[in-house]
């Protein structure tokens, strides 16, 4: 089997191939200097940046080609002012934050309060001599900050713009950011179309891997690409021996002529029951395998690392209520998919009215159901304030994998997902398992 793995990098001043080479080195469990013994660097004929290569590994899953969706060059022209305004807005509107981010907010408030208390105590204790000291220190206080500002302005600007600026521009659909968001998504869709429309049909499956902000981009790409393809995804419901939870969702449609059969409780995955999650994931793969020859959809897996989607109620919507509305209206795909009717029966089929004004039932997956056949695995470090579990927001069919045995308390854990052994072991499980698993 030959598969393609697409890596989507996160925030920061990334350079082309920087994330891809480090990721492949971590997954293979070797230093980058040893990679030349096991991989082939080949031209990337799909991306148009002229800066990228694809790394081909022959030992794993027969053959795996690693691609990088590089988007940093599209994120230019960011200034620090709107980024700081966004940060201040969140600081002074804690009600907009979820529970995990509110802990960070309380930490910032505690630091600011401690500084204010320390200055007050200093004034009360040393007040009498403070007047004399002010005569000397005021000029220094006037000159010093200007010197420090001149010295550090470049670094502060780089820190704010180069890191937080990426997240601000992609996650906020303000008018100045719309073109940037569109350019990044267009580049990703072009890559996915190229992999699917390859004349040689080299790949049997495609896996998307997104780190940090790259996981949000990967989620968006699956959403938009599925909307292009879903009308061509027609289900085969005749294979009686391989009925799955997904096909039973279709067959229990209240729109069917016969009385709808109720869904069994075991058909619905539960985050409290890992076996039910694994059963659902198996059914996703069975459905894909049963329809593989006719499916125009090769993306079998989404793997997210340190994903800010764990804060989707803050970053993608204005609170949990609006996120729920978006999911119910299938603007935000979930796993399992939301049904098409208000009775929450998991309806995945649709009726069309043709030119003859006759209703024709077509068994297809609706435009918000990519995770009927695409599995979602989410890896996170418990200490990572950016990443975290996502199944509580996007559905119990997602496999959340906490990486608690290493790097569990490090504040730098967000950038350690392919640098620690336990994380790389989970990555290998997600990327190189058999297609039937």
Range-by-range predicted roles:
Residues 2-41, 171-348, 376:
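Serine-dependent carboxylesterase/thioesterase catalytic core
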Residues 29, 126-127, 143-144, 154, ...:
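Short, flexible coil/linker elements and helix-boundary hinge sites characteristic
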Residues 49, 118, 129, 262-265:
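Acidic/proline-rich low-complexity IDRs
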């Amino acid at each position: 089997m030959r598969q393609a793995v697409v890596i989507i990098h996160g925030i920061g001043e990334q350079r082309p191939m920087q994330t891809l080479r480090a990721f492949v080195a971590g997954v293979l469990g070797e230093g980058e200097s040893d990679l030349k013994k096991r991989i082939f660097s080949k031209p990337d004929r799909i991306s148009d940046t002229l800066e990228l290569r694809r790394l081909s590994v022959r030992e794993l899953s027969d053959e795996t080609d690693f691609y990088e969706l590089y988007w940093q060059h599209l994120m230019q022209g960011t200034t620090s002012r709107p980024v700081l305004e966004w940060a201040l807005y969140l600081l002074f509107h804690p009600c907009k934050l979820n529970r995990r981010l509110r802990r960070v907010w309380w930490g910032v408030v505690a630091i600011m309060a401690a500084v204010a208390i320390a200055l007050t105590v200093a004034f009360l204790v040393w007040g009498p001599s403070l007047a004399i000291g002010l005569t000397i220190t005021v000029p220094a206080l006037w000159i010093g900050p200007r010197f420090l500002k001149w010295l550090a302005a470049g670094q502060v600007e780089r820190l704010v713009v180069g890191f937080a600026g990426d997240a601000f521009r992609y996650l906020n659909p303000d008018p100045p950011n719309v073109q940037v968001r569109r350019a990044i998504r267009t580049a990703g869709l072009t890559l996915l179309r190229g992999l699917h429309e390859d004349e040689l049909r080299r790949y049997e499956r495609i896996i998307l891997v997104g780190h940090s902000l790259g996981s949000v981009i990967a989620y968006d790409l699956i959403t938009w690409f599925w909307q292009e393809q879903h009308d061509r995804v027609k289900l085969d419901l005749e294979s009686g021996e391989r009925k799955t939870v997904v096909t039973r969702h279709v067959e229990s449609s209240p729109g069917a002529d016969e009385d709808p059969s109720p869904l069994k409780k075991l058909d619905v995955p539960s985050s409290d029951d890992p076996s039910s999650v694994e059963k659902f994931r198996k059914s996703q793969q069975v459905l894909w395998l049963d329809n593989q020859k006719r499916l125009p959809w090769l993306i079998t897996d989404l793997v997210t690392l340190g994903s800010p989607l764990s804060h989707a109620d803050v970053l993608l919507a204005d609170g949990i209520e609006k996120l729920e509305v978006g999911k119910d209206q299938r603007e935000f795909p979930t796993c399992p998919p939301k049904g098409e009717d208000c009775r929450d029966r998991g309806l995945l089929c649709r009726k069309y009215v043709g030119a003859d004004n006759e209703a024709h039932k077509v068994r297809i997956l609706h435009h918000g159901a990519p995770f009927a056949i695409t599995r979602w695995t989410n890896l996170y470090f418990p200490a990572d304030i950016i990443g975290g579990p996502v199944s509580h927001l996007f559905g119990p069919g997602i496999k959340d994998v906490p990486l608690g045995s290493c790097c569990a308390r490090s504040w730098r854990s967000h950038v350690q997902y392919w640098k620690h052994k336990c994380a790389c072991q989970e990555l290998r499980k997600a990327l190189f398992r058999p297609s039937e698993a």
